[in-house]
Amino acid sequence: MTKKLHIKTWGCQMNEYDSSKMADLLASTHGYQLTTIPEEADLLLLNTCSIREKAQEKVFSLLGQWKLLKEKNPQLIIGVGGCVASQEGEQLRQRAPCVDVIFGPQTLHRLPEMINHVQGTNSPVVDISFPEIEKFDRLPEPRAEGPTAFVSIMEGCNKYCTFCVVPYTRGEEVSRPSDDILFEIAQLAAQGVREVNLLGQNVNAYRGATYDGDICSFAELLRLVAAIDGIDRIRFTTSHPIEFTDDIIDVYRDTPELVSFLHLPVQSGSDRILTMMKRAHTALEYKAIIRKLRQARPDIQISSDFIVGFPGETQQDFEQTMKLVADIHFDTSYSFIYSPRPGTPAADLPDNVSEEEKKQRLHILQQRISQQAMEISRKMVGTVQRVLVEGTSRKNVMELAGRTENNRVVNFEGSPDMIGKFVDVEIVNVYASSLRGILLRTEDQMDLRTHESPQSVIARTRKENEIGVGIYQP
């Protein structure tokens, strides 16, 4: 009888990536098949996030529901991973004894052994250590699920912003070897992936070892990824302003595969608040980065993160944030009311901003950025946009949906054979969360690179010397 696995994922794209790797790993080692129905599962995994307010309460609320399932099925195994698990550790089991496995973001690759331990000894196991980059050596080969894919290139953070738990839950920055990343992306490209999104808590802090013992910078990695046959779009998230060096900006100047869209968190427009957050840059320095980016790529759109109501934030501080929003003309944002995270320095600061004031400031900020996003969308009407077709439209299965470079969903009429390919569409209408397009040309009518598999490249370029040793000759 097939064993079923249910994974509930909260949080960032890194968590989504980790959950997909857990599913692949447990399918290869234990034959688990994914199910969306918790009641069907033999193994329940919760991949948690501790960034937002009341993260712990949310976890224990769901575990209370899963406890009832375990009472009906004592053989059910319950595991909790992610950042809350890393924070809480053994204390998590004290509040929720139904949990059998507790693992951190850096130990998910040990899940098969942990499950075997629980099944063999009927006793719980906790592993929230930070074994550097070991997990990537233990995960199965990547499996494409559509024309886009996420690839983790580094983990952790060394910045220790005063509001953030990431350095404490995911550890300090560790970069994967560049060859491992390129091989994973080449495997995905051979399966039809056209767009890759490089992931990391501070992705532009990437410093990965090369095969010859040198160090590959993030800018160098971007160019190497762009050279992989079949990869026509590159995104990355999340980056930090102090790591956004000029060599990365140069890649925007000469590498068209890198999209004209960047998510670069700033958190506040007030230098005083930025100092209290330990962001290590000023608003002016942030604006200088954007100015240089727009010189290199005039059509680039910028999104960001904002925290409103940080302890001590005055009305003047907030107005400086709003000025930055207007000056940069941000496209979109992830903006939240500040909530203290246990164990962070900011949690000890006196919170003298009223809840009403926080809510009002958040509303003003979000309204302004929504207006700016709509302005940008309306300016796209009448333009021709290259769209990567991801599948059928959510609202009408008879239509297709894809994304523009600046991350907007476009719905249009087309045929199923276009899925996974690029098309050019004219934007004819704008809606709250999507655009309407008319198909102009298909990928076959474009001057794109011809897709060629790694195997065919080797077959075409392999030569042998006089003693029969294979030589690569480009």
Curated annotation (Swiss-Prot):
Q: Which reaction does it catalyse?
A: N(6)-dimethylallyladenosine(37) in tRNA + (sulfur carrier)-SH + AH2 + 2 S-adenosyl-L-methionine = 2-methylsulfanyl-N(6)-dimethylallyladenosine(37) in tRNA + (sulfur carrier)-H + 5'-deoxyadenosine + L-methionine + A + S-adenosyl-L-homocysteine + 2 H(+)
Per the database record, which ranges form the Radical SAM core domain?
Answer: 143-375
- Residues recorded as binding [4Fe-4S] cluster 1, renumbered to this chain, are C12, C49, C83
Name the Gene3D superfamilies for this protein.
Answer: Methylthiotransferase, N-terminal domain, tm_1862 like domain
The note describing how and how many cofactors are bound reads:
Binds 2 [4Fe-4S] clusters. One cluster is coordinated with 3 cysteines and an exchangeable S-adenosyl-L-methionine.
Could you tell me which residue ranges the TRAM domain spans?
Answer: 378-441
Q: Which residues are [4Fe-4S] cluster 2-binding?
A: C157, C161, C164
> What functional role does this protein have?
Catalyzes the methylthiolation of N6-(dimethylallyl)adenosine (i(6)A), leading to the formation of 2-methylthio-N6-(dimethylallyl)adenosine (ms(2)i(6)A) at position 37 in tRNAs that read codons beginning with uridine.
* Quaternary structure and interacting proteins, as annotated: Monomer.
Q: Which family does it belong to?
A: Belongs to the methylthiotransferase family. MiaB subfamily.
Name of this chain's protein: tRNA-2-methylthio-N(6)-dimethylallyladenosine synthase
- This protein's species is Yersinia pseudotuberculosis serotype O:1b (strain IP 31758)
